[in-house]
Swiss-Prot record:
The modification Phosphothreonine is found at T57, T211, T229. The gene is TSC22D4. Keywords: Cell projection, Cytoplasm, Nucleus, Phosphoprotein, Repressor, Synapse, Transcription, Transcription regulation. The keyword Oxidoreductase does not apply. Forms a homodimer or heterodimer. Forms a heterodimer with TSC22D1 isoforms 1 and 2. Interacts with NRBP1. This is TSC22 domain family protein 4.
Length: 395
């Protein structure tokens, strides 16, 4: 890519993962792809990619949304960084991955990566990605520098209509469980939330969001009955419960806040499910299941109604066409039957006239026949219809 004359590129075709657990020392190193011999790759904006060299590995290497992304595929290294080592002109780092990312988070992660581009250090989107996956931030080895800890600090706003908009677009944070339960991410950000303020500290593995809300209660059902609820109904149930508690806190006075301290009720999202406080509320898992069941039934009925509304026009059109076809066939059959009846009536009339003529002729012949001729009639099989005439011509 130097001088616009020579272009070289590489592509990682496969990455094998061999991971046994978050703290198992027996995890084997996955095979690292062989580096190419060409010049180092450049980012789509023209800047050369930085060499780690034993320092903080860049986490945000994704191209901006408008740049072409057909030559390179940027893969984030959220956790499990090993010791960097040199291989030729490249500095390589072994990565251990856990397959905890559901397929439904692909678009969310891509949107987070696209919204926060650049080549900085451990920024907000990587921390939010870790929090959305339910993973704690990794503890880097001694060879790597410890990055800043990302905090989400909301402004001290008064609780009111602004607190109703509980779902925002800044960060996707969930309370993780110890089991591999695929739960939908719970958005926790205020509309007037300020950008995060990075702080350096020794604890690089903490990412939490403190959102003060009046009498807010969210239960972290790690391994209970909430894991058996569908994701859509759970999300609707949680949203409805949050709106009910935020909208009318005076009506539900029996519900205690999340924290035992009434002065600072806050909702903390941490990377460990054991640190989450579960309030002993009367509306527990049973109420959550009832709300989720009601919302799922309403959603199913709404989908059925929309399907009926969308397909009612086509069904009515098909019924009309069938009725028109049946009417056409009926009219054709009626015309054919009428024509056949007229033809049969004509034939019956002709046969009746002929029969009358034959009977008249037969009577005349019998009147004119002789007794000898009439005596021969039974032998010929012709019945005698009348008395024989005394004199008459022979037949």
């Amino acid at each position: 890519m130097s001088g616009g004359k020579k272009k070289s590129s590489f592509q990682i075709t496969s990455v094998t993962t061999d991971y046994e657990g978050p703290g198992s020392p027996g995890a084997s190193d996955p095979p690292t792809p062989q580096p190419p011999t060409g010049p180092p790759p450049r980012l789509p904006n023209g800047e050369p990619s930085p060499d780690p060299g034993g320092k903080g590995t860049p986490r945000n290497g994704s191209p901006p949304p408008g740049a072409p992304s057909s030559r390179f595929r940027v893969v984030k290294l959220p956790h499990g960084l090993g010791e960097p080592y040199r291989r030729g002109r490249w500095t390589c780092v072994d990565v251990y991955e856990r397959d905890l990312e559901p397929h439904s988070f692909g678009g969310l992660l891509e949107g987070i990566r696209g919204a926060s581009g650049g080549a900085g250090g451990r920024s907000l989107d990587s921390r939010l990605e870790l929090a959305s996956l339910g993973l704690g931030a990794p503890t880097p080895p001694s060879g790597l520098s410890q990055g800043p800890t990302s905090w989400l600090r909301p402004p001290p706003t008064s609780p009111g209509p602004q607190a109703r908009s509980f779902t925002g677009g800044l960060g996707q944070l969930v309370v993780p469980s110890k089991a591999k339960a695929e739960k939908p991410p719970l958005s926790a950000s205020s509309p007037q939330q300020r950008p995060p303020e990075p702080e350096t500290g020794e604890s690089a593995g903490t990412s939490r969001a403190a959102t003060p809300l009046p009498s807010l209660r969210v239960e972290a059902e790690a391994g209970g009955s909430g894991a058996r609820t569908p994701p859509l109904s759970r999300r609707k149930a949680v949203d409805m419960r949050l709106r009910m508690e935020l909208g009318a806190p005076e009506e539900m006075g029996q519900v205690p806040p999340l924290d035992s301290r009434p002065s600072s009720p806050a909702l903390y999202f941490t990377h460990d499910a054991s640190l989450v406080h579960k309030s002993p509320d009367p509306f527990g898992a049973v109420a959550a299941q009832k709300f989720s069941l009601a919302h799922s039934m309403l959603a199913i009925s709404g989908h059925l109604d929309s399907d009926d509304d969308s397909g009612s026009g086509s069904l009515v059109g098909i019924d009309n066409k069938i009725e028109q076809a049946m009417d056409l066939v009926k009219s054709h059959l009626m015309f054919a039957v009428r024509e056949e009846v007229e033809v049969l009536k004509e034939q019956i009339r002709e046969l009746a006239e002929r029969n009358a003529a034959l009977e008249q002729e037969n009577g005349l012949l019998r009147a004119l026949a002789s007794p000898e001729q009439l005596a021969q009639l039974p032998s010929s099989g012709v019945p005698r219809l009348g008395p024989p005439a005394p004199n008459g011509p022979s037949v």
